[in-house]
Design a protein with these regions (language model features):
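Bacterial Sec-dependent N-terminal signal peptides
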Residues: 1-30
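Alpha-helical cap/lid subdomain in secreted, periplasmic
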Residues: 8, 33, 54-70, 79, ...
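Membrane/wall-proximal cationic-aromatic binding patches
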Residues: 28-39
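Catalytic nucleophile-elbow at a beta strand-turn-alpha helix junction centered on a G-D-S/GDSL motif
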Residues: 37-51, 77-80
Length: 467
């Protein structure tokens, strides 16, 4: 849904999502990012330890290689709206964002109390707390100038999977009431709004029809695995109008040796050969790569598993289409001398999506970008672990950004009886030093610089040879 004051032109783009995948869920719209945007993703542990923001940036790195922008993870584990507001100036505004996404609600609504006898009263209490705390956040956000606000309704708590019986009944129902508060605020203030909850519930329950123990939301019912985060990225990018944008659309007629369509690419040196067709193509984008390896603490699934719940994912967000008519028989397709596949003329005349072939030179280039972006994510995680220590423990104790010996003594004191905090001793000892933080920031900047050097598409030679 669009609530931005200047977005009326986009109203006509609202479409009903495919009912088989997202039943009873209306498509929503967010303005695409622009060159030079600085985007901060504000949230709790789902943002903090998750990948959705990294995957969104990876899409922009590969699909818009000439449009450099910057994104930052501003999540802190365990935060409610109250803690987000407390760290907001130091953690978020200090990054000078031009776009700010804001999500909360998982921690605000409570947990085990939903299984107590007075769960209804507890739910009302937590909703009222969330309303009051979010109202303060709303006033803060309203006071900011020059920042585009995007309210994001949180990913769900999985209260339907049967993989165990440890379920906080109706917790997600209360989370949806919190999301309604965000939607109302978006309407009041002309902010953009995207609900992740209902579409992800729909995706989850679709799989649970055949496998009741399935969960997209993670083994703790709270934190989506990598495939769940890629589903979040899909919903976000879909809302930005990226679904259906071509990596390249190459259409040629081999009989005439002519290009019939070239979308988001430039085709040249078309040459009919005795047994097929040869041409060069320079695409404006790279494929959107899907990682098959799990990343992040406690995660078990690679992002590529998103295709189980969104089978059209690759065609929707990474369509590098090749269509060639006027051929007969079976043909070998090679790119830069690398054999890609043997294809029938009928298949080629219908068209193929080259993004489904991970060994093409252009997909391999995209995988390099992905690997560098993952390295950047890992460095950024050090800052988010430090943020948890700094804002949730040191700041309340009066030692925000304090690298004095007195602060170190307070940290050691706070670690007593808190095993989670004690496990971050190494993080504290490193990140409390501004020189160390500066070095890691330079490392991330270097990685991003390198990404925007290596993500530039290259011209490739395509050869179709009859077998």
């Amino acid at each position: 849904m669009i609530y931005g004051k200047n977005n009326m032109k986009k109203l006509f783009t609202l479409l009903l999502l495919p009912l088989a995948v997202f039943p009873r869920v209306l498509a929503q719209s967010i303005a695409p990012f622009q060159k030079g945007d600085r985007v901060t993703f504000v949230g709790n542990s789902i943002t903090d330890g998750g990948h959705y923001h990294s995957y969104i940036w990876l899409y922009y790195m590969t699909h818009f290689p000439g449009m450099r922008l910057w994104m930052a993870n501003c999540g802190v584990g365990g935060d409610t709206a109250k803690e987000i507001l407390a760290r907001f100036d130091d953690d978020v505004l200090s990054k000078n964002p031009t776009v700010l996404t804001f999500t909360f609600g998982m921690n605000d609504t409570g947990y085990y109390e939903y299984n107590n006898a007075d769960s209804a009263a507890f739910a009302r209490q937590k909703l009222q707390e969330a309303r009051e705390r979010f109202a303060l956040c709303e006033e803060k956000l309203k006071s900011l100038k020059g920042i585009r606000m995007v309210m994001i309704g949180t990913s769900p708590y999985d209260q339907t999977s049967t993989f165990n019986d440890n379920i906080f009944a109706h917790k997600n129902d209360n989370m949806q009431r919190v999301i309604a508060l965000q939607e109302e605020a978006a309407k009041r203030n002309g902010w953009e709004f995207l609900d992740l909850n209902k579409p992800m519930v729909a995706l989850n329950m679709k799989q649970q029809e055949s496998d009741p123990a399935y969960t997209l939301i993670g083994s703790d019912r709270i934190h989506p695995d990598n495939d769940g985060h890629m589903a979040i990225a899909y919903l976000f990018l879909q809302a930005q109008g990226m679904k259906g944008k071509k990596v390249a659309d190459m259409q040629l007629d081999a009989a005439s040796g002519k290009v019939t369509r070239a979308e988001n690419c430039r085709i040249s040196k078309v040459k009919k050969t005795a047994d097929g067709l040869q041409f060069d193509c320079l695409a404006a984008s790279l494929p959107f790569p899907l990682d098959t390896v799990p990343h992040g603490w406690g995660f078990n699934n690679g992002a590529a598993k998103v295709t189980k719940v969104i089978p059209t994912f690759i065609d929707d967000l990474s369509d590098e289409h090749l269509t060639v008519t006027g051929l007969s028989g079976n043909l070998e397709l090679s790119i830069d001398g690398i054999v890609i596949d043997t294809l029938s003329s009928a298949t080629l005349s219908t068209g193929i999506n080259l993004s489904r072939y991970r060994h093409t030179p252009q997909y391999q280039q995209a995988l390099t970008v992905m690997a560098l972006n993952e390295t950047r994510w890992e460095v950024e995680r050090r800052f988010r672990e430090w943020a948890w220590v700094n804002y949730d423990f040191m700041m309340p104790a009066g030692f925000l950004n304090d690298n004095s010996e007195q602060a170190a003594r307070k940290f050691r004191e706070l670690c007593k009886g808190n095993d989670w905090l004690a496990s971050k001793r190494g993080t504290y000892d490193q990140m409390v030093r501004p020189e160390v933080r500066e070095a890691y920031e330079k490392e991330m900047d270097l990685l991003v610089d390198h990404i925007y050097e290596l993500n530039q598409p290259k011209q490739h030679t395509f050869l179709l040879r009859k077998l």
